[in-house]
Structures are given as C-alpha cells and as structure tokens.
Swiss-Prot record:
PANTHER family: SERINE PROTEASE INHIBITOR KAZAL-TYPE 7 (PTHR47499:SF1), SERINE PROTEASE INHIBITOR KAZAL-TYPE 7 SPINK7 (PTHR47499). The keyword Glycoprotein applies. This is Ovomucoid. One of its GO terms (cellular component) is extracellular region. The record marks L16, E17 as: Reactive bond 3. Keywords: Disulfide bond, Glycoprotein, Protease inhibitor, Repeat, Secreted, Serine protease inhibitor. Pfam families: Kazal_1 (PF00050). It comes from Dendrocygna viduata (White-faced whistling-duck).
C-alpha cells in the first residue's frame, strides 16, 4: 500500500514542483504538499490511491 507522511502539514503555500499523486477521490494532485493539504481538509478521509496521475 502506498503511503505519504502528512504529519508536517498543512502548509500555507505549496511549491510548483510536479510529482503527481492520485488520491482516493480519483483526483490527481500535483505534488505531496497539495495532496497533504487536501488530506488535512478532508479530516483524514482522503487517502493515497497510487503515485502518478489518476
């Protein structure tokens, strides 16, 4: 199972670095920061489906 450590999030701003991750909501997030901020916003219900685009 793919996992991402989001313990140091949320962050106020994310870089434009592009390393896509696919969330359990079937949405592609541009990088770990964007994904982790969304995880925090979802109260932990969002999980990582896999690395790369959905």
């Amino acid at each position: 199972v793919a996992t991402v450590d989001c313990s140091d999030y949320p962050k106020p701003a994310c870089t434009l670095e592009y390393m896509p991750l696919c969330g359990s909501d079937n949405k592609t997030y541009g990088n770990r920061c964007n994904f982790c901020n969304a995880v925090v916003d979802s109260n932990g219900t969002l999980t990582l489906s896999h690395f790369g685009k959905c």
